[in-house]
């Protein structure tokens, strides 16, 4: 099995390392200038009024800094953060236990918030709006509801699939921030910062070589930095240069556009097996042996953003850029315009 180095998902070891690289305050945070600027205003205003921050929703592809920003919000507000995720909160009682253990002003961070069950969401609505829990006592005709006050808190939700959030839940967030892919300059700066923290000697050209293959994602840039460090140590003099980074990333099968073996497998399946498409998601998932959700949430966003793939009402199609990247000819009778239709 080939290890995937450009997936934005965490491994357990990386979770610990990533925490050490995270900025603690907004002024240290690189990139996302629009979201960062707005957050700074909202945080300063809330602190000035001595109120808890309004509920915040971060959404965007994996690895762009949603968890980091949630921790920064808590740090900037000078409060504690309690972290959990949608799939972990299975029953209303699980959420009630978390909410009743919060202190005034605390941040509750729920990752993958789109995966909360409807029955758990129902408990969350009055908690977000009125800072109360509706507790049902008894059963049947004699059942009654009592309201339990809870501390004022800030809910920070994170999701890769904002479209799956129910409207009532989405409407209760006062601050909604969409996170974008990072530029090469921003990723090079992040790679340089991480290298300093980890005490890794790196040249400017080495930073940019890692950055341009990191798929616009800081988490991937940090992962590639650590793997390139290994090659620099064993195959070089310990310093990450452009040549060392190029050699290492080529050995890891990450090409100069940031595509890895899974991206190539998916794009070449569309080009070679389905004549460029369109092909349905289920058929494509079966053809490459991957889960549909993984294709939609992890693989496709970068390919769509960078013009390698297109979604149409009839399915996925490979774009002209994908054909050029793999040095393939557009099929006879199919114009470049039709690849985008």
Swiss-Prot record:
Binding residues for Mg(2+): 67
SMART domains in alphabetical order: AAA (SM00382)
Single Gene Ontology MF annotation: four-way junction DNA binding
Uppermost EC category: hydrolase
Keywords: ATP-binding, Cytoplasm, DNA damage, DNA recombination, DNA repair, DNA-binding, Hydrolase, Nucleotide-binding
UniProt GO cellular component terms: cytoplasm; Holliday junction resolvase complex
Purpose of the protein: The RuvA-RuvB-RuvC complex processes Holliday junction (HJ) DNA during genetic recombination and DNA repair, while the RuvA-RuvB complex plays an important role in the rescue of blocked DNA replication forks via replication fork reversal (RFR). RuvA specifically binds to HJ cruciform DNA, conferring on it an open structure. The RuvB hexamer acts as an ATP-dependent pump, pulling dsDNA into and through the RuvAB complex. RuvB forms 2 homohexamers on either side of HJ DNA bound by 1 or 2 RuvA tetramers; 4 subunits per hexamer contact DNA at a time.
Family: Belongs to the RuvB family.
Domain notes: Has 3 domains, the large (RuvB-L) and small ATPase (RuvB-S) domains and the C-terminal head (RuvB-H) domain. The head domain binds DNA, while the ATPase domains jointly bind ATP, ADP or are empty depending on the state of the subunit in the translocation cycle. During a single DNA translocation step the structure of each domain remains the same, but their relative positions change.
Name of the molecule in the record: Holliday junction branch migration complex subunit RuvB
